[in-house]
Amino acid sequence: MKKYIVLLLSFFLFSLQLVSQSIDKIVNKNIYISYYSSKLKVPLYVEYDLFRGGGSVSRKNMRFIEEETTAKNKDYAKSGFDRGHLVSAEDFAFDKQLETLTFSYYNVFPQHPKLNRGSWKAWEAKIREESHRYPLKIFVGGIYSTKKIKNKIGVPDYCWKVVINKKTGKLMHVLLFKNDETQAAFRTTLDDLQKKINYKINFKR
């Protein structure tokens, strides 16, 4: 009986996850496309191209833009989570207008501060450096279950990145990050990632 209850609970939680992880809005922000869940008020993933990213534009006076159906600034206040960029602001720091586009809640999910400022940031810098050698197609997203902050905003259990060399089509990185204080990062496969996110992404474009 106990085993049956555990299985039933597991199925219920998995069903909740499937319901949550559904894209109901696709938003084109010029430099990236956000595949957004209005239920979770976060992007499930974004995709963008990057070539020779980086620059010296200051982000000092840039503010996050609140838009229809998105999270608000107050939702993150005292939440214990950073407003983590999926598309790194520094990737487009060669142009102020383009960098400003990354400060949208269509490009933000809650990230543990140690991850956002640690291994996540380090990998952003590494990938940006690689963009000076090859044009890249980049996908960035989260894997969600039931964790929330204020206003029922979904918190990813894991964050992920997929990086493809656009010129050759070669898969360069499939990375999974634990969204906690361990900031653990490890490589995985596209097949394994696809099973975890429960919705289809066409990575080969």
Name each region found by the language model.
Residues E66-R205:
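Domain-level detector of nuclease and nuclease-like folds
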Residues Y4-F14:
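Sec-dependent N-terminal signal peptides
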Residues F14-S15, Q97:
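Hydrophobic alpha-helical membrane context
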Residues S15-S22:
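Boundary at the C-terminal end of the N-terminal hydrophobic targeting segment
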Residues K25-D82:
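Short, His- and charge-rich active-site/binding loops that engage polyanionic ligands
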